[in-house]
């Protein structure tokens, strides 16, 4: 797999966007202390000045596309690219994502773009409840397709852990708590709040970290515990009232 450092990414973004590049922000696990080497990717937010609303010229657009492809080939999602105006007016649409970015970030280029950006608890609760139910349905579908295949069950557990932690951090923010950097502590606290056993998630964290891989006899039970926990979390959020 090709490699590209964050410094090289910023250099290429500056060359592609020139004066339109306002800010580049690293967010997520790599900025929050729970990055897993050789497994976690790097999430990057790119903010552009509109400069009179004119579209990118063809050479700039082509250069930006080449940067995104190279970053993707290095194992990372393409940069999330927005205009400054879009960034400033979208926190009510993506409150979970904004809350995560606001709390776990590192500015790589330009000015910090966070002044005046807020996330309301009502917006957060609405998106969180929808996302939890959506994840529950995805897990059920994945479990059906995996059947009793332990390898596919383990892959589903590993692939879903990052999203689970995004949801869990949002639950803690809904309660006015700052999520711990450690995924074990996060899952344990959310389990206590919502009334589910966090053990399947703690086991999944060890699996993903490479500390103790899931055995064939464990995978089905861990996946089943995942589904049961998210079912309970969905019920909890449906009945949740702010203190």
Language-model features: where?
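Metal-dependent nucleotidyltransferase catalytic core
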Residues: 1-17, 32-39, 44-94
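A nucleotide- and high-energy phosphate-metabolite-utilizing enzyme signature
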Residues: 4-7, 17, 21, 105-109, ...
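Conserved nucleotidyltransferase catalytic core and NTase-mimicking acidic/glycine-rich helix/loop elements
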Residues: 6, 118-243
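Secondary-structure boundary/capping signal
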Residues: 21, 75-79, 109, 179, ...
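Short gly/ser-rich loop at a beta-strand->alpha-helix junction or flexible surface loop bordering the NTP-binding
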Residues: 22-30
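Conserved NTP/Mg2+-binding pocket subregion across the NTase superfamily
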Residues: 65-155, 242
């Amino acid at each position: 797999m090709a490699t590209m450092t964050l410094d090289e990414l910023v250099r290429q973004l500056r060359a592609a966007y020139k004066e339109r590049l306002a800010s580049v922000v690293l967010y997520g696990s790599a900025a929050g202390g729970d990055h897993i080497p050789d497994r976690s990717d790097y999430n990057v937010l790119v903010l552009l000045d509109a400069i009179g609303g004119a579209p990118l010229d063809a050479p700039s657009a082509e250069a930006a596309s080449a940067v995104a492809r190279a970053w993707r080939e290095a194992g990372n999602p393409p940069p999330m690219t927005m205009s400054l105006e879009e960034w400033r007016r979208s926190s009510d649409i993506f409150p979970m994502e904004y809350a995560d970015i606001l709390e776990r970030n590192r500015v790589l280029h330009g000015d910090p773009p966070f002044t005046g950006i807020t996330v309301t608890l009502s917006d957060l609760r609405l998106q969180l409840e929808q996302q939890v139910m959506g994840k529950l349905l995805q897990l059920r579908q994945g479990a059906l397709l995996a059947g009793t295949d332990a390898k596919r069950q383990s892959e589903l557990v590993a692939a879903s852990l990052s999203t689970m932690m995004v949801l869990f951090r949002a639950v803690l923010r809904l309660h006015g708590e700052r999520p711990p950097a450690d995924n074990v502590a996060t899952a344990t606290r959310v389990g206590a709040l919502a009334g589910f056993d966090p053990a399947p998630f703690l086991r999944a964290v060890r699996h993903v970290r490479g500390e103790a891989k899931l055995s064939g006899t464990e995978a089905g039970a861990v996946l089943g515990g995942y589904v049961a926990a998210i079912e309970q979390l969905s019920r909890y959020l449906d009945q949740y009232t702010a203190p």
